[in-house]
Swiss-Prot record:
Binding, Zn(2+): 54, 65, 67
Source organism phylogeny: Bacteria, Pseudomonadati, Pseudomonadota, Gammaproteobacteria, Candidatus Palibaumannia
Pathway given in the UniProt record: Cofactor biosynthesis; riboflavin biosynthesis; 5-amino-6-(D-ribitylamino)uracil from GTP: step 1/4
Residues given in the record as GTP binding sites: 49-53, 70, 92-94, 114, 149, 154
Record's protein name: GTP cyclohydrolase-2
Gene it is expressed from: ribA
EC nos: 3.5.4.25
InterPro entries per UniProt: GTP_cyclohydro_II, RibA, RibA-like_sf
UniProt cross-references to SUPFAM superfamilies, sorted A to Z: RibA-like
GO molecular function: GTP binding; GTP cyclohydrolase II activity; zinc ion binding
Keyword list, A-Z: GTP-binding, Hydrolase, Metal-binding, Nucleotide-binding, Riboflavin biosynthesis, Zinc
Active site as annotated: 126 (proton acceptor), 128 (nucleophile)
Biological processes annotated in GO: riboflavin biosynthetic process
Amino acid sequence: MQLKRVAEAKLPTPWGDFLMIGFEEIATKHDHLALVYGDITSKEPVLARVHSECLTGDALFSLRCDCGFQLAAALSSIAEERRGLLLYHRQEGRNIGLLNKIRAYALQDQGSDTVKANHQLGFAADERDFTLCADMFKVLGVYSIRLLTNNPQKVDILTQAGINVAERIPLIVGRNPENARYLDTKAAKMGHLLHDRYK
């Protein structure tokens, strides 16, 4: 295991009370969260979302991405189901960090798309490590999930890491004029499954 469970507390939200569980990476001391709703211990596949940190979208209401919209929709769906969990994967900006994300935004303002901007800064299109999320699921005793995602790479990596993705559930929300090019680029260059809804 790459991380350990270190703390937990109730988290009241507009959608109901979640159990917030804090994890710490053993090698780096970086922290991550799980938000658990209801009983996730049965063997039935659990509704789940792996949500990568996005300060600008999640906390600052940015329209440049769909992250904040996805976070709210996922928590709402989990609460409506009365059972599920959201992993808050703290790898900001597809794991290039907040300051580099701002630099990437500046390049996008000059005409680069989200993938090209990462490359111009010396990064891959996506630097995230989803094997950490597989370990979080395992620590929580969750081995079979119904995953809220548009990203088939998440499905593949979690599956290879021993998590059964019984179903992929699209999470297509929040498109607007500010993020349309970003979403189109994720579909065209990163394989995200978005166009059934938008085209």
